Regions:
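A glycine-rich helix N-cap at a beta->alpha junction
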Residues: 95-104, 189-195, 222, 547-561
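Long, well-ordered, tryptophan-enriched scaffold segments
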Residues: 199-417
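Acidic, glycine-rich active-site loops and adjacent beta-strand->loop/helix elements
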Residues: 78-83, 168-175, 198-203, 233-235, ...
Length: 722
């Protein structure tokens, strides 16, 4: 589809081109200052990816100073962090001191961070590929918050949907999680999603394979995306229209990526006839080529041959403003790594830094006098006041600097729980959600569940039967319509409260991240619950860490876990997952043994997921049915089991030994106690509900040099029974 758009105003284009140069300068200087000028206390290289930043300055300038609206959200590729912070500085949303402290304590972060940066990062990025997928799932969550009537009741107005935008490096397409996410997006008919590929054709160790763009086009087209190649800038397009221009275009099209990069480096280094020699050799006798070459000296020819669309402000703006619908868009923007700097095109430029001599050359080229390095608006081709006014009035800059805190969700004093005298924690989990699903509470309306194709086997089935599966299209349950008996009745509609995912754990955790940030992103607080088999946490561990790193709030229910997985065989055992629960920041892990413990922990979890200093929760549950205690859950007991442990059977005075357990092994523990109590009458049983909380409380006490909170009321000797 061809869409006609109004041309960019010449005055605005001139301003944006000037701002682009300032963004390039500030981002390069930020890295230079951190590595060569700032005092180093340890002599370690700081780094900062100057070349990766230089390739994206045109696109980022176009986005933040012209294209983005308040409701749009952006994931900036990790290695473009200096560009992002330079732009926020020019928008008045970042301080000079933080730029000077880039990659040091209290300064701007190496990679954009929601939790550590202070200038409005929408999505943390890094590891590579995760932020890209995050925009896709955020788009799905945006649709959910807009379509779910129960969620939208508190909202006075449903605003126009924003575009979820990922500015990504081409090497990120090597990450498999991107393709897993794309497939899930296709299933859900994802919309309002832009992925802008910085196609500089260079990665950490060299140059990418020729023809990669064709594969990219095929991948995206196959799942319903509109693919927009941005290859040639306006200068080249004008020359292509001349006699011999078609042949010149074909020469560039056929030029291997590594040769093009090498010629780019030679050209920017000022080598005589860097481009002219191969063009004269390869295009000898082609009518019109001689005239084109004669009309350009070496500098002009270098500027022409590197006039790729990703560095042409007019071409970039035309492409972005040509989007006429909410279909997902993939922009393949041809760029040059290190563009406009002495590093341009060199195969080793990924981790390369301009040395002092190169920076002097670059400073002279950018016309930045000494003492003006950190100026946001001076030394441009436009007046400083004009530049400042344009920046401060950018559409994106109308976004409030601080995200609004959505109202908290009311949690009842007790969660509904009806259980048999013998039951498992997994069954109790399903029972609690089923009871909630039958009510009309604020809590029930804000719970959203998701699972990677293990919904039924993790006991979410009754919840889904009551609440439905989220879908942009209404789809009936065919088995039910055909009167085929089934325990499941899955209706799909826009108010469903379950996202059914394929078997891809990365998708689960990034989906939970997007749902868990729905409050700050879209103004609607949700309480997401994700389920999976406990061993497969390891399949998506980097994505889990990514979700926790940006302080997304969710409940992760891993079930079955522990010994109840024995029939699954050796590859399905959850051996190391307790260590994941202990080691993962932002995630509190629990392993209750009884149904009443689970109800208390889940209620606390829903509160913690909303607390300023709270976090996410990881529950390891079991399918092993055990006899339930007949007891009153008093506040003191609730407090102890939330803190991590309580006395299941208190020891008597003089006790020097105790049996300590966690989870569904309690029948064996009680049996052992019965066998030992005659010989050791003072013996007690300690129930650990959270080895995570217990350990971190002890660790904190060591750091703070204070007495640990006592759960045992006795000193355990070196000889103990566990």
């Amino acid at each position: 589809m061809t869409v006609k758009t109004k041309p960019v105003k010449k005055a605005d284009l001139r301003i944006l081109q000037s701002l682009e140069k300032k963004v390039l300068w500030l981002s390069m200087w930020m890295v230079h200052n951190a590595n060569h000028l700032r005092q180093s206390v340890d002599g370690l290289k700081v780094g900062g990816h100057q070349a990766s930043s230089a390739s994206i300055t045109t696109i980022m300038t176009a986005l933040y100073f012209n294209v983005l609206k308040v409701q749009d959200r952006v994931a900036v590729k990790p290695h473009a962090s200096p560009v992002f912070h330079a732009i926020q500085y020019m928008l008045g949303r970042q301080t000079e001191d933080k730029l000077k402290a880039f990659r040091s304590l209290g300064g701007t972060q190496s990679y954009p961070s929601r939790t550590k940066d202070t200038d409005g990062v929408d999505f943390s990025t890094g590891s590579v590929g995760l932020g890209v997928a995050m925009t896709l799932f955020a788009s799905m969550v945006q649709d959910y918050t807009r379509l779910n009537e129960a969620v939208n009741k508190p909202l006075a107005k449903v605003n126009k949907p924003g575009r979820m935008i990922a500015v990504m490096g081409d090497a990120e397409l090597d990450e498999g999680n991107i393709y897993e996410a794309m497939l899930e997006g296709w299933k859900y008919d994802v919309r309002n999603l832009w992925w802008i590929i910085d196609y500089n054709r260079q990665s950490l160790d060299g140059v990418v394979s020729d023809g990669l763009f064709r594969k990219i086009q095929d991948f995206f087209a196959n799942v319903g995306w509109n693919v927009v190649p941005l290859k040639y800038g306006k200068k080249l397009e004008k020359v292509f229209a001349l006699q011999g221009g078609d042949t010149l275009r074909q020469w560039i099209d056929d030029c291997p990526n590594d040769l093009y990069s090498a010629l780019t480096f030679k050209g920017q280094s000022g080598e005589k006839d860097a481009w002219r020699s191969p063009l004269k050799k390869d295009l000898r006798g082609v009518h019109g080529i001689k005239s084109i070459l004669e009309d350009h000296d070496d500098n002009m020819l270098h500027a022409l041959m590197t006039n790729l669309a990703g560095h042409d402000m007019e071409a970039v703006l035309e492409a972005f403003h040509s989007v006429a619908d909410d279909r997902p868009q993939c922009f393949i923007a041809y760029t040059i790594k290190g563009h406009g700097t002495p590093l341009a095109g060199h195969r080793d430029n990924h981790a390369g830094l301009m040395n002092l001599e190169q920076m002097d050359v670059f400073r002279s080229k950018m016309q930045i006098p000494e003492g003006s390095e950190w100026s946001a608006y001076d030394n441009l081709l436009i007046e400083p006041e004009t530049a400042k006014k344009f920046c401060l009035q950018a559409p994106f800059n109308k976004r409030p600097p601080q995200e609004n805190e959505p109202p908290k969700i009311t949690i009842p004093d007790n969660l509904p729980l009806n259980f048999r005298s013998s039951t498992s924690t997994q069954a109790s989990f399903g029972n609690i959600l089923h009871e909630l699903s039958r009510g009309n509470t604020d809590l029930a309306s804000r719970i959203v569940t998701t699972s990677p194709d293990v919904t039924v086997s993790t006991n979410l089935g009754p919840w889904v039967n009551q609440r439905g599966v989220f879908s942009l299209d209404v789809r009936n349950d065919v088995f039910r319509d055909e009167k085929v008996a089934s325990a499941q009745k899955w209706l799909r509609h826009g108010t469903g409260q379950h996202f059914e995912l394929g078997i891809a754990e990365n998708n689960l955790f990034i989906m939970l991240a997007a749902l868990g940030l729905s409050g700050p992103l879209f103004g609607t607080r949700l309480l997401p619950i994700g389920t999976l088999y406990d061993p497969f946490i390891a399949r998506g561990l980097d994505s889990l860490n990514y979700a926790c790193y940006q302080d997304a709030r969710f409940m992760l229910v891993a079930t079955p876990a522990g010994i109840t997985l024995a029939p699954e065989g050796g590859a399905h055992q959850s051996i190391s997952s307790p260590l994941i629960g202990i080691g993962q920041p932002g995630l509190s892990s629990y392993e209750p043994a009884y149904a009443d413990e689970l109800a208390v922990i889940m209620r606390w979890a829903f509160e913690s997921m909303q607390a300023e200093n709270g976090g996410s929760i990881y529950l390891r549950l079991s399918t092993r049915a055990i006899d339930q205690p007949s007891r009153e859950m008093k506040p003191e007991l609730e407090n102890q089991l939330i803190k991590g442990a309580y006395w299941h059977i208190p020891p008597t005075d003089g006790a020097r030994i105790a049996i300590v357990y966690s989870g569904a092994v309690v029948p064996e523990v009680i049996e052992a106690y019965e066998q030992l109590k005659e010989e050791i009458p003072e013996l007690g049983i300690m129930a650990i509900t959270s080895y995570d909380r217990l350990y971190h409380d002890w660790q904190r006490s060591q750091v703070e040099n204070i007495e640990a909170v006592s759960y045992t009321h006795l000193t355990l000797p070196t000889r103990s029974l566990v």
